Amino acid sequence: MNRIRYCFELVSVLFLMFTANARARGRGAIDFDVNYVVTWGQDHILKLNQGKEVQLSMDYSSGSGFESKSHYGSGFFQMRIKLPPRDSAGVVTAFYLTSKGDTHDEVDFEFLGNRQGKPIAIQTNVFSNGQGGREQKFVPWFDPTTSFHTYGILWNPYQIVFYVDKVPIRVFKNIKKSGVNYPSKPMQLVASLWNGENWATSGGKEKINWAYAPFKAQYQGFSDHGCHVNGQSNNANVCGSTRYWWNTRTYSQLSANEQKVMENVRAKYMTYDYCSDRPRYPVPPSECRWNQ
């Protein structure tokens, strides 16, 4: 009898913990309109689940996009995204940080569609002071079109880290002392769905099949974990304080375990690295030896 009572009480406790966690997750979901605003393709954007989810769509007439109301100088930015299914060659779904102007800074996640049955590419890139050309591509180890997956960008004074489902896949370190520019301008968080058929799939050889339009991508997770800064400023260094958790020593470099996990992912799933592209860069860019 005591054993039965114990089992019943244990199940009851676990149930209460589950429901409490579920409620906490519900309270943590932020409405899109709190931190973001639609910037283009207004008639191609649909708010779902009481504003907790946004669907971007693209047809022959237009794509769509949104951006954060605030500018940031550092932070940890995440978005849950489900990509367009079926034949999406030429279609680009994006999630990135960017400043404005010819000498802009930018930190990119771009998801490059493909023919049905072929893998979508996860492309990352870093622009600093207008200089990009730092593409690295990965094949996801899951189907990004059937469910939501979390994509994250850590940006602090020490490093930029790209995450997929909390797994680090790329690091770009701040090595300004070695003459390599590092993103330091106030940036906004941007998401978009657009026509990239001139370059996105097989170098632009595979064009969009409009018979599959409208293409749709869903976004969730509109919380705000960044240091707000004046968008008119050219300096985000005011956001380097360790009073922000993402700037503390813990996040100044990957742990030994994170480094090992990242190396494993890169060995198995990275399909292109600008640092290894000798026809393009006969001499590898100087930051490459620091970011392996």
UniProtKB/Swiss-Prot annotation:
EC class of the enzyme, as a word: transferase
EC number, UniProt record: 2.4.1.207
Protein name as annotated: Xyloglucan endotransglucosylase/hydrolase protein 2
CDD domains from the UniProt entry: GH16_XET (cd02176)
Localization per Swiss-Prot or TrEMBL: Secreted, Cell wall; Secreted, Extracellular space, Apoplast
UniProt modification remark: Contains at least one intrachain disulfide bond essential for its enzymatic activity.
Any one GO CC term of the record: apoplast
GO molecular function, one term: polysaccharide binding
Gene3D superfamilies in alphabetical order: 2.60.120.200
Position of the signal peptide: 1-24
Location of the GH16 domain: 25-219
Keyword Transmembrane: no
Predominant location category: secreted
Catalysed reactions, semicolon-separated: breaks a beta-(1->4) bond in the backbone of a xyloglucan and transfers the xyloglucanyl segment on to O-4 of the non-reducing terminal glucose residue of an acceptor, which can be a xyloglucan or an oligosaccharide of xyloglucan
Positions of xyloglucan binding: E110, Q123, T124, N125, G133, R134, E135, N198, W199, G203, R280
Keywords: Apoplast, Cell wall, Cell wall biogenesis/degradation, Disulfide bond, Glycosidase, Hydrolase, Secreted, Signal, Transferase
